[in-house]
Every structure is written in structure tokens, then in C-alpha cells.
Amino acid sequence: MSAPAGDPYETRLNIYYGPLEIIREKELADACTYKWYNQTLCRVNDSVVRMAVIEGEYHWHQHTVEDEFFYVVEGRLFIDLEGRTVELAPREGFVVPHGTLHRTRATQRTVILMVENATIVPTGS
């Protein structure tokens, strides 16, 4: 699925890898030319693992029911929360609890993995 017309975010909800396949996140990230790209890599029970390549900022949003886990592969990720900002370096992760207003941003090209419930639509709400 592509982003709606005029939306700067390229979001693909199709599951790229099936069970028993080697997941090659680096190959996908290296081939990415988008400033903001989100690809669902695989499904694990009721959750999905998504890879994002980002540069710039996302809009403020929250998920009313589900938590989100962010893990930085390369670059630096900033997660703005009400009242504070969390900065993540490579090999660091952070959980945003459901109901928490937040936005993600990166001042340089950054690759992250997200683990979240499969019901989350990664465009935020």
C-alpha cells in the first residue's frame, strides 16, 4: 500500500518476508530512496516487525490501545513526548505506551525497526 496522494510517507503494509525466510533488512534499507519509508517485514503471532527509513519529522499522534517499540539500527532517532524528548542511538530501543502523544523525527537518514500489534496502522491517529 502506498501513501495517499500528497502524503510524504511511503507506507507498505504487505508482509515482505514469510516464515522460514531470512530477513535482510539491510538490503531493503540500502535500496530505499524515500525520505520516509515504512515496510512491514514479517508477522510474529499478533504482532508485526516493521522497518522504517526516515529523515525529517512525523506528525504528532497516539495509539489508543497498542504500545509501540522502536529500535535504532543506524542513525539517530528522536521521540518527542509531551514534556521531554528521547534520543536513541544505534542498538538502543524504547517503548511508547498506548495513549501517549508522540512523534518521531530524525535529523539525518535513520533506519529503525518497530515491533507493534498488527492492528496498528502506521500512519498514526
Task: Pin down the residues of each PLM region.
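Glycine- and acidic-residue-biased ligand/ion/polar-headgroup-sensing regions
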Residues: 56, 65-78, 82-83
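Conserved short histidine dyad/triad with adjacent acidic residue
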Residues: 34-35, 48-64
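Ligand-binding loop in jelly-roll beta-barrel domains
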Residues: 98-125
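A short, N-terminal "cap"/entry segment at the start of jelly-roll beta-barrel domains
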Residues: 1-50
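Short strand-coil-strand connectors
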Residues: 45, 80-84, 107
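Short acidic-glycine-tyrosine-enriched beta hairpin
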Residues: 82-98
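Short beta-strand segments in beta-sandwich/barrel cores
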Residues: 49, 58-60, 75-80, 120
